[in-house]
Amino acid sequence: MNVVDLFCGCGGLSLGFEQAGFDILLGIDHDKAALDTFKANHKGSEIIHGDIQTITTNDIRRIIGGKNVDVVIGGPPCQGLSLSGPRKFDDPRNQLFLSFVRVVKDLKPTYFVLENVPGIISLFKGEVKNQIIKEFSDLGYVVDYKVLNSAHFGVPQVRKRAIFIGVLHGEGPVKFPTPLIESEKDFITCQQAVSDLHGLDDDVMPESFEYASSPLSAYQKLMRNGAPSKLNNHLITKHQEKVKSTIALVPEGGNYKNLPENFVSTRKFNVAWTRYHSQKPASTIDTGHRHHFHYKHNRVPTVRENARFQSFPDSFVFLGNKTEQYRQVGNAVPPLLGEAIAKVLKK
């Protein structure tokens, strides 16, 4: 089955579909560094760098050689949608979503998968959610939605995403994946995710070097399957001693509230500061790299550690500068979540 990814980023959702046996025909994104990463890791896929609003369906058909498209996937912003008052088609926040609708209308795939932040479900008292459903229902799709937690699907991170799935009328019901891990006590932990990676916090390690040990968990074995012997994207940030001493004040699983009272009143700190817990999944990975701390070492996680928390295999290499790499990882849909969704469509 063939897939077109309209807001592909570095390709987390596409990778999940690929792991489930789908063919990724094309990725489209305006972020050059993310698209470079997408192309490097999806070598058989075509790419278009540009604004989806200016890319026509004919452009897409030409690039993919007229092949049939079975699934359109992507995560367009939907915050501008509301049923209250007149539809503001010129609202710039609506244009990317409407471009997604346009491509689905023209390509008429059997399925579409639209992902977004969980808050989209309740935004404007549910009006945005209702508008999303209406737009695709008018095109002949049966649409349903669900908020899925990545941790239920083997990802060592508590990351919730709103997933809308549409099935062309007459092609069957909408299905969602069943959690692979039901109980929180069985979630994949931070330690299970990254304990085989060098964790030194007193030295800047080279960009590429060997693993600290053989795989210490089933998850690590999965992440290292097919990976080269040298590890990429594991450049450790060298913090100043003052920063390291501050991080050291945050206990495992703690946050800024655990800082001493005299520190809070005299020093700069960030309310987003959180230290991961070795025996729990990571909290939601963001696009920056200054708010979360390693569960053991007095530093921020590396790009590779964040990628592990997102379920990117070690064979997946991120391009661009370090800030761009962190952004790509933080913006991505965890591949294992994408794979679980894709497998349901394939049944």
Positions of PLM-derived features:
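Core alpha/beta nucleotide-donor-binding catalytic domains of modification enzymes
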Residues: N2-K108, P118-S122, E127-N130, S137
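Class I S-adenosyl-L-methionine
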Residues: N58-K67, L83-F263
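Short, small-residue-rich loop/turn micro-motifs
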Residues: I73-C78, L168, H289, P313-D314
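C-terminal target-recognition/interaction regions appended to catalytic cores
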Residues: P215-K347
